[in-house]
Amino acid sequence: MIPALKIRQPIEPWEKFLTDSITTPEELSLLTETEESDIHKVISEYPMFINPYFLGLIKEKGDAIYRQAVPDIREISKLEGFVDPLNEEGLSPVQGLTHKYPDRVLFLVSGRCAMYCRFCNRKRKVGRASMVTRETIREGLSYIKSTKDIRDVLLSGGDPLLLSDKELFKILSELRSISHVETIRIGTRIPCSLPHRVTKQLAGMLKGFHPLYINTHFNHPAEITPQAASACSLLAEAGIPLGCQTVLLKGVNDDGMLIKELMLKLLAIRVRPYYLFQADLARGTSHFWTALKKGLGIMAELQGNISGLGIPRFMIDLPEGGGKIPITPEYIRGIKGDELVVKNYLGDEYRYPIIDHGDQKGYTGHKAEYK
């Protein structure tokens, strides 16, 4: 009897980008022997993976896209920071799930990314086969089912959108069957790093799981291409609210005018700027860290110079699992009597009444007479 042949399903076009991704320095052009040697040293600890689409966004060696994707010897020569900067492992009741806040969890459902970001706060996990398994997903779902306080689940990884439609459908269906889970969020860089993955079929499938929110991750205006815009359009047309979590990175986007351009371009493709993160204190990423005053200065530049829709919240994710906190430019100068003294985006001081409106004292906000 002739055994039946196992018929392999044809790969999707977007999967070809993954199979053609580069993982060694020899596949990069314009590198010196020293640079190739340095990259080999780095990838022995922190792997490299760059798909052809994202590689094509690099215009010259050392530009903003290059810095995000190509390994740098400083990843292993500068050892500041934490291996697990947010204490995700310490706050993990089961492998692959972090329960930091009372009503929500971070659930890792994929160990794959379309490219390995050199500033990743999960560098300790990237490229490891054990990062996510069927067993960790099963245990995560079981924990969510048994923990009634959980109303919000954030899917992350790796990148959840690199699961097949079938795999993602199964996980989302399981979550939607849990009565106390109200909101599902997906954290993904796919609209930026491999927008071809966002197909009509994927968007149509996701549409069936509302309320579903997606936060994506663009760091530079050069990442907003026609392909990225098309991917975001498909998701938006499926009724999925889109936000963006940008990371402030030295040598990539630590400039107020550039961040303003990025925020405006995000709005144009129907993505709401959500967070601007101070880079996490992950080991191997210190060459990307910016001074806190840099981020505060950028936020001050945005205020009054761009619509409120385009202003993200400047956030720090505290080390050791302290959680996210907003950091804002200081607009309050003090209190004079019954008035709050503040400055506007131009630096002019104003007074604003701090009494109850029902006091009927006739107070109105006005420009301060002093500077």
Predicted regions, residues:
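Conserved AdoMet/S-adenosylmethionine-binding subsite of the radical SAM
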Residues: 138-145, 149-150, 161-306
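Conserved, mostly hydrophobic/aromatic
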Residues: 54, 117, 274
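Flexible, glycine/proline-enriched loop segments at strand-loop-helix junctions
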Residues: 38-39, 125-131, 158-159, 189
